């Protein structure tokens, strides 16, 4: 059965989960987003750390990300800063996470995912 790591990135919290894509959550958690106090790099490090943990526990098939900010969905790059995530613009989220996990990644604005 397929497993997907999914993230909902907001200004204050990041919701993380592993799902089978059919509505069953194998694991889920809510973490404080460190971007406001420690910078975007700390947020990226947290995402990569969770991906590695999830990948150890479950055979992952892909990664899905819903995030605050304007997203170029084709490239998975943050096209415009999110008001609550400083210096987010230009972050190549899709590339970073794909390279870290070796998996396909989809990134979209969180409102479009609701």
Give the residues covered by each predicted segment.
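Short glycine-rich, Thr/Ser-proximal phosphate-binding strand/loop in the N-terminal lobe
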Residues: 2-45, 58, 78-79
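Assembly/interface hotspot detector across virion components, adhesins/toxins, and nucleic-acid enzymes
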Residues: 5, 69-71
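Glycine-rich phosphate-binding loop and adjoining helix at the ATP-binding site
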Residues: 34, 41, 45, 71-114
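Phosphate/pyrophosphate-binding loops at sites that engage ATP/ADP/AMP, CoA/4′-phosphopantetheine
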Residues: 44-63, 101-105
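Glycine-rich beta-strand-to-loop/alpha-helix junction loops that act as flexible
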Residues: 63-69
